[in-house]
C-alpha cells in the first residue's frame, strides 16, 4: 500500500503486491513504484501501467529500497522474498525505461544516497553492517568501490539519507535508533532514539528540509512501533529528485 499525505489527509493506494519504494515522477500526481514484479507507474487511482522488469531478476526476489539520482534515474535493489537467498541481490538502474545492472553479489541491498559534491555514491548491504562508498560517474551511472564509510555497531543498517553537510544518517534495524556518522571519518556525531526496535528508514523534509522523518516497522509488544516519526535534529537535508520521464 502506498500512503500519500495530502492536505492533512492520508490517501492509501493498494497495489496488490509488495511495494519496496515509490518516488514522484516529473508528471504531477504520478509516481513510480518498485513492486514485486517490476517497475510501475501509479497515480491516485492505482496502477497505471508497467514500465518493465529486469530480464535477469532471480526467482523469489522483489524490489526493496529505491531512490533517484540528480539525473532522474531510479536506482533500486532486490532482496529475497523469503529471507536470505544468498548473494543474488542486485542494484538496478532504470533510465528512460531501460534497465541496467549497477551492482551485484549482495545479500540484502538497502539504503542509498549520493554526495554529488564529492562524486560519491553510498550503499548499504544490510548483513555487512557497514555503509560502503563508491566513486560515482554521474554521466554513465557507473560505480567503483572506494572505501567503507561507516561501521554500524547497534543493530544493522537499513535505510539512509545524507544531510546538507554530507553526513550519513542511518536507520538501525534492531538498534532502535537513527545515527548520524561523519562521512570522512565514520565517527558518530548524533543519534535519535525511537520507541521501536526496528527502525527502517529516514529522510529529511519540510519547507526548510530541517525535519527528519523516520519510519519504523510494527513489532509485537512494542506500542511505539509501526509509526512514522518526525523530529528536529539541528541539521538540514538535501533536495531529493523525482524520476524523469525523458
Question: Which residues fall in each region the model found?
Answer:
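Short loop/turn segments that connect beta-strands within beta-propeller blades
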Residues: 5-8, 43-47, 94-98, 135-139, ...
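A short loop-to-beta-strand structural motif that recurs across blades of beta-propeller domains
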Residues: 1-3, 38, 89-92, 130-132, ...
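Beta-rich, blade/repeat-based domains predominating
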Residues: 16-32, 57-74, 82, 102-120, ...
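Short, solvent-exposed loop/turn segments at conserved positions within beta-propeller repeat blades
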Residues: 82-88, 126-129, 173-174, 221-224
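A short beta-strand motif characteristic of beta-propeller blades
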Residues: 8-14, 49-56, 98-104, 145-151, ...
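Blade-level signature of beta-propeller repeat domains, shared across WD40, Kelch, NHL, RCC1
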Residues: 203-246
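Loop/turn-rich, solvent-exposed surfaces of beta-rich toroidal or solenoidal domains
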Residues: 130, 150-185
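Short loop/turn segments immediately following the C-termini of beta-strands
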Residues: 36, 79-80, 126, 136, ...
